[in-house]
């Protein structure tokens, strides 16, 4: 697979924070999340088609918005689990590189700031991107608790230019 990072992140994140984001994305590749997600979507669609071919009330439900909602829930839950695993991968990626894993929480804080700046524009690319991701506050808290629990000191939050 390939990893893509928005170049604008380089303007707001330190090298360690960017490395954490890259580690997160590498985690998706290492865990074959795209392949597994595609397989889940195909199986869910096939199951839905199989039920609807039988006719009756079950078919009516699978063809309705309720069926679409069920399919979305299956895929969203899977996606949230993948995101947590990719977050953990990014955290470990930083540690293995000899970097401070607090960078995961700090990168999420900056992403949250970007999301807040996008505001109520539900159609913004950023809000669309994060609509399938776990809540950033929960992700920040989880990474902070992990680093604190491991006795890792939080670095001073430097401007990206000063950090390079």
Predicted regions and their residues:
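A Zn2+-metalloprotease active-site environment signal
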Residues: 1-164
């Amino acid at each position: 697979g390939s990893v893509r990072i928005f170049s604008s992140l380089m303007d707001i994140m330190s090298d360690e924070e960017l490395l954490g984001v890259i580690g997160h994305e590498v985690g998706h590749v290492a865990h074959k999340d795209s392949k597994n997600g595609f397989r889940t979507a195909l199986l869910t669609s096939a199951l839905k088609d199989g039920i609807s071919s039988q006719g009756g009330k079950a078919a009516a439900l699978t063809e309705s918005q309720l069926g679409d909602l069920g399919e979305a829930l299956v895929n969203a839950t899977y996606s949230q689990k993948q995101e947590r695993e990719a977050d953990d991968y990014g955290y470990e990626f930083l540690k293995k590189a000899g970097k401070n894993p607090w960078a995961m929480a700090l990168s999420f804080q900056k992403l949250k700031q970007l999301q807040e700046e996008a505001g109520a524009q539900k159609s913004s690319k950023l809000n669309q991107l994060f609509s399938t991701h776990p809540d950033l506050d929960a992700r920040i808290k989880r990474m902070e608790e992990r680093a604190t629990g491991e006795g890792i000191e939080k670095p001073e939050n430097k401007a990206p230019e000063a950090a390079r």
